[in-house]
C-alpha cells in the first residue's frame, strides 16, 4: 500500500511560515522526523519525499503550483501511482477555526479555501481525508488575503507549533492504525 500526504501552501521563501503554509510546516516536520529530503519534480509540479513505514510507502508532498492550483499536483500523483482517494490525506489551514485548533474530516466542502477547491475540481470528489489547522480570522479590518499571507505573531506561532505537533501525532497514529475514522475519534475534540 501507498499513502499520499499532501500539505498545502505556497512555494518560495516569501511565504515561508505564513499562515497559509501550515500544511507545508507539518509536511516539513514529518520529513525531518523521518530524515528524508525533498526533491522537486517538474512533471508532478511538487516537492516530494518518501519513506517506508510498516512496509507501506509514504509520499510527502508539497505542491509547487501555488495554493490555487494544488489540485493539479494531487491529481497527477494519484493517477500516476494508481492510488485510491482513501490513500490521500490533505493538511491545510482553516481561517474559520481558532488558531491552533485541529479538525480531522473525511469529507466536506472547500469552505472558501482555494487549494481545497482546486483539489475537489481536479479529483472530482469532496470525499477525501483531511486535517484542518486553525489560523483564526483576520483582525482589525485586515483583508483575508493579507491575513493568510502574513506570518504568525509570537503567541499564535507558539500555538501553531503545538498544533503541528498534535497533527504530527495524529498523522502517525493514522499511518500506524490505517483507519481514519478511528483517528478522527481519537484526535477531534
UniProtKB/Swiss-Prot annotation:
SUPFAM superfamilies, per the entry: Peptidyl-tRNA hydrolase-like (SSF53178)
UniProt main location, coarse: cytoplasm
Enzyme class, UniProt record, top EC level: hydrolase
Compartment(s) where it occurs, according to its Swiss-Prot or TrEMBL record: Cytoplasm
Documented EC number(s): 3.1.1.29
Catalytically driven reaction(s): an N-acyl-L-alpha-aminoacyl-tRNA + H2O = an N-acyl-L-amino acid + a tRNA + H(+)
Record key words, sorted: Cytoplasm, Hydrolase, RNA-binding, tRNA-binding
Superkingdom as given in the UniProt entry: Bacteria
InterPro entries in alphabetical order: Pept_tRNA_hydro, Pept_tRNA_hydro_CS, Pept_tRNA_hydro_sf
Record-annotated site: Discriminates between blocked and unblocked aminoacyl-tRNA: 10
Pfam family, one: Pept_tRNA_hydro
One example of a Gene Ontology biological process annotation: protein quality control for misfolded or incompletely synthesized proteins
Annotated catalytic residues: 20
Site (Stabilizes the basic form of H active site to accept a proton): 93
Matching PROSITE patterns: PEPT_TRNA_HYDROL_1, PEPT_TRNA_HYDROL_2
The family this protein is said to belong to: Belongs to the PTH family.
Name used for this protein in its record: Peptidyl-tRNA hydrolase
Lineage, uppermost ranks: Bacteria, Bacillati, Bacillota, Bacilli, Lactobacillales
Recorded name of the encoding gene: pth
Amino acid at each position: 500500500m501507498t499513502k499520499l500526504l499532501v500539505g498545502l501552501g505556497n512555494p518560495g521563501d516569501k511565504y515561508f511560515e505564513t499562515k497559509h503554509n501550515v500544511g507545508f510546516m507539518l509536511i516539513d516536520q514529518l520529513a525531518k522526523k523521518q530524515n528524508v529530503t525533498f526533491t522537486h519534480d517538474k512533471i508532478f509540479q511538487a516537492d516530494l519525499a518518501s519513506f517506508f513505514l510498516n512496509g507501506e510507502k509514504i509520499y510527502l508532498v508539497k505542491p509547487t503550483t501555488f495554493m490555487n492550483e494544488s489540485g493539479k499536483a494531487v491529481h497527477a500523483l494519484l493517477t500516476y501511482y494508481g492510488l485510491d482517494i482513501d490513500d490521500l490525506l490533505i493538511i491545510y489551514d482553516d481561517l474559520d477555526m481558532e488558531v491552533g485548533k485541529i479538525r480531522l474530516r473525511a469529507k466536506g466542502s472547500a469552505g472558501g479555501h482555494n487549494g481545497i477547491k482546486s483539489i475537489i475540481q481536479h479529483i472530482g470528489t469532496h470525499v477525501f481525508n483531511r486535517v484542518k489547522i486553525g489560523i483564526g480570522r483576520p483582525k482589525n479590518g485586515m483583508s483575508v488575503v493579507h491575513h493568510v499571507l502574513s506570518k504568525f505573531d509570537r503567541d499564535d506561532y507558539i500555538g501553531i507549533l503545538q498544533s503541528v505537533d498534535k497533527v504530527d501525532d495524529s498523522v502517525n497514529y493514522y499511518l500506524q492504525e490505517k483507519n481514519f475514522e478511528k483517528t478522527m475519534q481519537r484526535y477531534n475534540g
